[in-house]
Amino acid sequence: MFLINSKTVNEINTKMFYGWIIVLIGGLGIFSSGAGQSHTFSAFLPIITKELNISSTSISTAYMIATLVAAFLLPRMGKFVDKFGPRIVLITTIILLGFGCLLFGAASNFFMLALGFGFLRFFGQGSLMLCSSNIVTQWFDKKRGFALGLMGLGFAISMGLHPPISNYLIEVYGWRMAWVIIGFSTWIIMLPPLIFLAVNKPEDVNMLPDGAEKITNEKNTKSKIIGLNLSEALKEKCFYILAFSFFSISMLVTALHFFQVTILNEYFNLSSQIATTLFIP
């Protein structure tokens, strides 16, 4: 059930394809995933290490475990998306991500820190990116790559804004209040468009992907499916080679981003302000 009705969507669609509004919502989702991304945590690592008296090794271990657990739970989230649709799952994810920010800001020991990492990695870096991509792909077929490319700009903007803004919030309000602000801003940015504008797929409002006209010829409506299904893909060696490649790249980039501010502080004697601005693409 959607708060926006088919009539309103079609009125907007006469001026521009409604799928581009979905791309904007998806881009906001990718941007908001910054609350659970390594480039944001990097700004907080030096102050958390100092205030909680927890070593960088212990924090990175907790972060690694939280990331791996979140990754292995993502297929379950994918099933929820298939069952309930991306919109309701996105709304739930955003609500829980906001509470994850509040939980992380209240961390006073290693256990709470690890739990906060788990919340933020699963609902931010994992689920939010998954659902945002899913809802965009529902609205596009021939222009899917272009639409996903536009949506991906949200991540670049997040890399450019979240670290320096986080550093500013830490300096002005302290790291705990910074997480409260991030949590509430995530709700403010994402909940209104998801509640009032998001639609799972074009068929829900009597439309087709890419804004295509309806085809009455039954022969032409049959789409040709090319590729492998899940069970077939899992039997191919190339699947595991590609999966390992993406896994390795993600782990390397995560490690570098997570420690970037700390490394630049300690080994290059750069201030946190400069270190966080270096994330700007």
Predicted ranges, named:
Residues L150-D204:
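Helix-loop-helix hairpin linking two adjacent transmembrane segments in secondary transporters
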Residues Q37-P46, N229-P281:
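Extracytoplasmic gate region of multi-pass secondary transporters
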Residues I95-S108:
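C-terminal ends and interior cores of transmembrane alpha-helices
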